[in-house]
Amino acid sequence: MANKVLRKVTHCVFDMDGLLLDTERLYTVATEMILEPYGKTYPFEIKEQVMGLQTEPLARFMVEHYELPMSWEEYARQQRANTEILMRNAQLMPGAERLLRHLHANKVPFCLATSSGADMVELKTAQHRELFSLFNHKVCGSSDKEVVNGKPAPDIFLVAAGRFGVPPKPSDCLVFEDSPNGVTAANSAGMQVVMVPDPRLSQEKTSHATQVLASLADFKPEQFGLPAFTD
């Protein structure tokens, strides 16, 4: 991938699942618990298609793709029940806490923009309440009425930017994502996007990001005009 021009930004917007919290692995287990009784498997090629989707489109896709004898509502209910059990001990991804505390200490405004509903965000962040209190605000796509269309549509990022005290231009926002759907949404919103993808994703699925990193620990804020780490 050719080097892309990195533009100075003033605000940051973070996805949550698979980026800040190690939840994608737990989602896989929760999904396999539903599929196993029907003799179905959940290969990565399917998982990468639904990463970043909100509850209803994800559930509709799974029921249709696997021809499951249930409604999308029932699928979503089972997924939620499994997830509630598994997510209580979700751990932070490498580099996440350092970056968030650095931005907060340097008064760089940042917010959360996740496809999860507000109640699931509360559940997943239960072990990290203080850290997640540092966000200026949280936009929870599956339960926020202003987010009409989920990722890959740009709605969630535009809503998130609009809720800062002094809303920045989209071009002044830097999005952090792990999913192709999220990257597409950020690009459509007119924002730069740093992607920390699952290493199994093909280069084709990561090529539209402004920058691709193996970990948030590799992020260099000064490349986007933000204060550099001093530790």
Swiss-Prot record:
UniProt entry tagged with the keyword Lipoprotein: no
Catalyzed reactions: psi-UMP + H2O = pseudouridine + phosphate
BP GO terms, sorted: nucleotide metabolic process; wound healing
Keyword terms: Hydrolase, Magnesium, Metal-binding, Nucleotide metabolism
Domain of life: Eukaryota
Gene Ontology MF annotations: metal ion binding; phosphatase activity; pseudouridine 5'-phosphatase activity
CDD domains linked to this entry: HAD_AtGPP-like
Active site residues according to the UniProt entry: 15, 17
Protein residues bound to Mg(2+): 15, 17
The UniProt record lists the keyword Acyltransferase: no
Broad class of enzyme this protein falls into: hydrolase
EC number: 3.1.3.96
Cofactor requirement: Mg(2+)
Stated family: Belongs to the HAD-like hydrolase superfamily. CbbY/CbbZ/Gph/YieH family.
Function: Dephosphorylates pseudouridine 5'-phosphate, a potential intermediate in rRNA degradation.
Protein's UniProt name: Probable pseudouridine-5'-phosphatase
Source species: Drosophila melanogaster
